[in-house]
Amino acid sequence: MGAGHDHGHAHGAAAAGTATSAYRGRLRMALAITLGIVVVQIVGGVLADSLALVADSAHMATDALGLGMALLAIHFANRPPSERATFGYARAEILAALANCLLLLGAGGYVVYESVQRFITPAQTEGRLALLFGVIGLVANLVSLSLLMRGQKESLNVRGAFLEVAADALGSVTVIVSSVVIMLTGWQPADPIASLVIALMIAPRTWKLLRETLSVLLEAAPKGVDMAEVRSHILATDGVEDVHDLHAWTITSGMPVLSAHVVVSPEALSAIGHEKMLHELQGCLGDHFDVEHCTFQLEPSGHAEHEARLCH
């Protein structure tokens, strides 16, 4: 006998789109700003012969693509469930976050390669021009960061975009510093060194986002949900004899789900009934854990052995 229910929260495709779609307008503004700065920095990099500027513009170009994918993911995440896609397309934002990680890694590799080439074949960078375009890039990135600051706490998709823009802002600072060094001392290696620093700044943020994204795709238990504690709370419910096939995973940002087979004594089922038992389990988990949707299968004693025989 089985029963599924939720905690009274929104769930399914609507909930999946909520965390990210609330920031759709801000993502669009950040995308427009980023595309504009890509063009400006490419022009500046060519005029100033600055690898740091060119590398930063290449990084920002991947960011623009990432922001575009984030917006596309929102579109798919808000599509309703179907017979085949029973959770809707909520996980589109997780795939977008993964793609952003790969783009960031590619951008970092490109910057490292070009920096090494610049050490082998030095070039004369125009410090003043590089400084001007570096400042323009920094101001634009700070505006984009302010647009995405709040959303990055609620959505992996938005967080991916936020981290990319943050890396760009740090990259702009690095360009500014290297430009000042070249202006004051004429030391040209400052430009490729700045490029390597940009690559190093990309790596740790990308790794953190990649781990979180893979955790969702591998259906690991949601962060903050202790499965041992969940089991203990279920077992503490009056009439519950055992719990098995306990699983918790995350569909997308802000949508953790849980399922369990709960063995209940015949006396408890007779005394309180299935509906009340489900409400007690609901209250048990709803009061202690942040789970968007729960599915419980209530079973009599010995049913687990019956399931095992059916599976072999």
Each PLM stretch: what is its role?
Residues L35, V39, A64, A169-V173:
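Hydrophobic alpha-helical transmembrane bundles that constitute the permease/transmembrane domains
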Residues R28-V43, A140:
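First transmembrane helix
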Residues I42-V54:
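Short, hydrophobic transmembrane alpha-helix segments
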Residues G2-G25, M29, A52, A58, ...:
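Alpha-helical transmembrane segments and adjacent TM-loop junctions that form the membrane-embedded core
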